[in-house]
């Protein structure tokens, strides 16, 4: 009321925004206090003609929210990231949430007169609905991902936002996690990321003069990108004699496709430097079904 009285005193009819809550609809002291603040703005608008924007925000989540206070998402992210216990009284409770970046986008739009309205109230147009149990299940899956080299399904907008939120609560000692390097006298092969529907991402290192590969696949396919060193990639269609060759280097990166039905290899042409190759494969390696058959190019 002090702000509104001051604006009226000086005849300033600039727009006024208030951050309220969906709990303003509840019949409890907190809800009553929120409704009282809203009504002050609506009365001020009727009296002065000034534009008012009343946002009833649902649960807001995102990085830097204080855990163990009034945000279940912040508490769950923080405690699970730190291997601390959580309590879920009723996992079937339905939550309506808005992401902090979406809130900021809406308020920036409101500054330009492009707010989203629903009757007397303004709103953030992107609201995510999920059960409390569903949130916990997702966050717990995030905690396990470094051990399985997996990543979330980022095609789902809420999962993408929740994963970013979860990462912001990681203790610093978990910013990094080790990878298993499969090392032999030829170099190494290291899986980085494994996905259920987008294949596998790996790094291959070949020592000077080493040839790797010399095999083909029925269905499995790969993309090779040399990021350091100087090498030769060769492919030959099974049952034919013609060899297709690509001289590659980290100085001019390019993708070379490993085509199903073509035996292929990769040769480190350097006598002194390792050949470092980023590799994508359309499926994660399954030792029970390797789909890999030895044959020299």
Task: Give residue ranges: language-model regions.
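Conserved beta-loop-beta element that borders a ligand/cofactor-binding pocket
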Residues: 39-64, 84-90
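A conserved pocket-lining segment of Rossmann-fold NAD(P)-dependent short-chain dehydrogenase/reductase
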Residues: 58, 78-98, 117-118, 123-124
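Mid/C-terminal beta-alpha module of Rossmann-like enzyme folds, strongest
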Residues: 109-180
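A short glycine-rich, His/Asp/Glu-containing loop-to-beta-strand
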Residues: 173-214, 220
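Conserved Rossmann-fold NAD(P)-dependent oxidoreductase catalytic core, especially the SDR/UDP-sugar
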Residues: 2-36, 45-48, 53
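Short acidic-glycine-tyrosine-enriched beta hairpin
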Residues: 237-262
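Substrate-positioning beta->alpha
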Residues: 65-75, 92-112, 133-137
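Double-stranded beta-helix
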Residues: 239-242, 267-297
């Amino acid at each position: 009321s002090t702000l509104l009285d001051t604006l009226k005193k000086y005849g300033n009819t600039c727009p006024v925004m208030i951050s309220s809550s969906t709990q303003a609809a509840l019949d409890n002291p907190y809800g009553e206090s929120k409704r009282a603040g809203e009504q002050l703005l609506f009365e001020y608008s009727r009296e002065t003609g000034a534009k008012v924007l009343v946002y009833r925000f649902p649960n807001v989540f995102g990085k830097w929210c204080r855990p163990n206070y009034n945000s279940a998402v912040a508490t769950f992210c923080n405690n699970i990231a730190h291997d601390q216990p959580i309590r879920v009284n009723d996992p079937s409770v339905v939550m309506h949430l808005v992401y902090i970046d979406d809130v900021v986008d809406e308020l920036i739009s409101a500054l330009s007169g492009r707010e989203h309205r629903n009757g007397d109230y303004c709103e953030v147009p992107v609201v995510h609905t999920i059960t409390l149990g569903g949130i916990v299940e997702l966050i717990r899956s995030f905690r396990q991902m470094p051990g399985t080299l997996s990543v979330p399904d980022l095609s789902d907008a809420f999962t993408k936002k929740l994963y970013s939120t979860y990462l912001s609560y990681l203790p610093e000692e978990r910013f990094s996690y080790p990878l298993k390097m499969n090392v032999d006298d030829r170099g190494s092969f290291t899986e980085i990321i494994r996905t259920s529907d987008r294949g596998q991402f790996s790094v291959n290192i070949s020592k000077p003069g080493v040839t790797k590969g010399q095999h083909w696949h029925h269905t499995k396919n790969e993309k090779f990108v040399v990021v350091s060193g100087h090498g030769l990639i060769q492919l030959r269609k099974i049952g034919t004699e013609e060899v297709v060759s690509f001289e590659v280097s980290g100085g001019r990166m390019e993708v070379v496709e490993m085509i199903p039905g073509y035996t292929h290899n990769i040769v480190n042409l350097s006598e002194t430097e390792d050949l470092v190759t980023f590799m994508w494969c359309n499926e994660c390696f399954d030792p029970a079904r390797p789909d890999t058959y030895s044959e020299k190019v």
